[in-house]
């Protein structure tokens, strides 16, 4: 098998998670939202400005349908590359050996402020929310084959559990299991993975991929974070990509859907299987062999990324050229209840810009706000209606060279 270089190295700083000990308390901590007071909310963005000396900011705005938002007299500067929102808090995560996590909320005036002590941890490659009060992070196992997980208490701002797993033993093939995402499914944690053998002495991303024509998911207990078993399928490729934090979602009826780009290693070797969506029925802990939604067959091209909207509908980016594994993308709505694809009108064809789609799904089950960069290098929010497949352009994120996250916080 040929040795390949992980094509995602350029974004390795993109999606990291952290945890650990302690740092400082902040007197501006706004605390949880008082349930007696009227609930107000603002949208928050994380973006990096343009220029060599540009910083990264968390900024807020009341309205994403028009106008512009920037860091001018707005928001806070952060030294982080990835972010997870839990318990009405934005956790800013640094991608380094110490891996500092800093919490941010909106205060009573609706301003973004640091909301408590910082927490140190290790370099993290996957993360995911569990319930309303916890999130889990996992380390980078590509060279070591050692999978470290931690459970982060988003209320008390502390680590509440850890585990270590030998990921080489999971595959039983001599290849390491490199997890590509972390998802809550029922009372378990599902971690999709691909098989990878690191080149001794090489960089962390240099090595040899295993089969590109199969799907694997490691099932872990919760809250113990102990490996239990692997479930697999052979109708598409592996789920997710390194540090993309997408590829699987449990929907309202308890069924879980997972999608594969089936793009191979992104450089030399391609998957022989189509890009599509598979299903795990509620409580089954195995793939449903009666269900396969062939997205590549329906659109003529492979999935790039996807995110759940609601009511069985997913927003998906697919490449514009058949067989492509990079470049221009267009947006579709994938209805997994009816195996139907609806093109999204109003969002221009554009370059795929990173590890995941930058989105925030509203609670109405049909609206998703998507951040994209246009051909002029400017970032806008597009407000997409999943029922009609239409989109309108909204707020301009001014001065942005990259946007990492969009969410909504109450205050």
Task: Annotate the PLM regions.
Residues 55-159:
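Post-signal peptide N-terminal segment of secreted/secretory-pathway proteins
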Residues 59-61, 105, 146-157, 204-225, ...:
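Beta-propeller blade signature
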Residues 75-87, 118-132, 170-182, 238-248, ...:
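Repeated scaffold domains used in trafficking and secretory/extracellular systems
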Residues 66-78, 111-121, 158-174, 226-235, ...:
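Beta-propeller fold detector
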Residues 288-377:
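Intrinsically disordered, low-complexity segments enriched in Gly and acidic/Ser/Thr residues
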Residues 137-146, 190-214, 257-274, 317-327, ...:
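Short, conserved, GDST-rich strand-edge loop motifs in beta-rich repeat architectures
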Residues 38-45, 88-91, 133-135, 187-191, ...:
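Entry beta-strands of beta-propeller and related beta-repeat scaffolds
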Residues 1-44:
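Bacterial Sec-dependent N-terminal signal peptides
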């Amino acid at each position: 098998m040929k040795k390949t270089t992980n094509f995602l190295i350029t974004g390795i700083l993109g999606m990291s998670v952290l945890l650990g000990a302690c740092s400082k308390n902040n007197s501006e901590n706004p605390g949880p939202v008082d349930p007696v007071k009227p609930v107000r909310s603002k949208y928050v963005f994380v973006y990096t400005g343009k220029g060599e000396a540009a910083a990264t900011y968390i900024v807020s705005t009341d309205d994403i349908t028009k106008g512009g938002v920037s860091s001018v007299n707005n928001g806070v500067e952060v030294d982080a590359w990835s972010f997870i929102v839990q318990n009405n808090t934005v956790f800013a995560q640094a991608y380094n050996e110490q891996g500092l996590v800093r919490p941010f909320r909106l205060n009573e005036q609706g301003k973004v402020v640091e909301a408590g002590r910082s927490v140190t941890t290790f370099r993290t490659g996957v993360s995911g929310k569990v319930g309303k009060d916890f999130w889990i992070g996992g380390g980078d196992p590509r060279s070591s084959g050692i999978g470290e997980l931690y459970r982060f208490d988003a209320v008390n701002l502390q680590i509440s559990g850890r585990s270590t797993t030998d990921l080489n033993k999971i595959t039983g093939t001599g290849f390491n299991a490199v997890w590509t995402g972390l998802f809550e499914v029922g009372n378990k944690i599902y971690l999709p993975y691909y098989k990878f053998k690191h080149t001794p002495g090489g960089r962390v991303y240099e090595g040899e991929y295993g089969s590109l024509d199969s799907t694997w998911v490691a099932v872990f207990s919760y809250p113990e974070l102990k490996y239990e078993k692997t479930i697999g399928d052979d109708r598409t490729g592996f789920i997710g990509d390194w540090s993309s934090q997408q590829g699987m979602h449990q929907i309202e009826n308890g069924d879980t859907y997972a999608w594969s780009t089936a793009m191979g290693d992104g450089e030399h070797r391609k998957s022989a299987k189509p890009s599509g969506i598979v299903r795990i029925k509620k409580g089954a802990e195995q793939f449903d062999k009666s269900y396969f939604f062939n997205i590549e067959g329906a659109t003529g091209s492979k999935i790039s990324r996807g995110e759940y909207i609601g009511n069985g509908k997913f927003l998906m980016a697919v490449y514009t050229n058949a067989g492509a594994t990079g470049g221009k993308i267009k947006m579709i709505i994938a209805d997994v209840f009816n195996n139907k694809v609806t093109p999204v009108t109003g969002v221009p064809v554009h370059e795929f810009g990173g590890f995941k789609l930058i989105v925030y799904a509203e609670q109405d089950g049909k609206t998703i706000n998507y951040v994209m960069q246009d051909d002029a290098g400017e970032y806008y929010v597009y407000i997409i209606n999943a029922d009609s497949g239409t989109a309108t352009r909204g707020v301009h994120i001014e001065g942005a060279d990259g946007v990492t996250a969009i969410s909504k916080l109450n205050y």
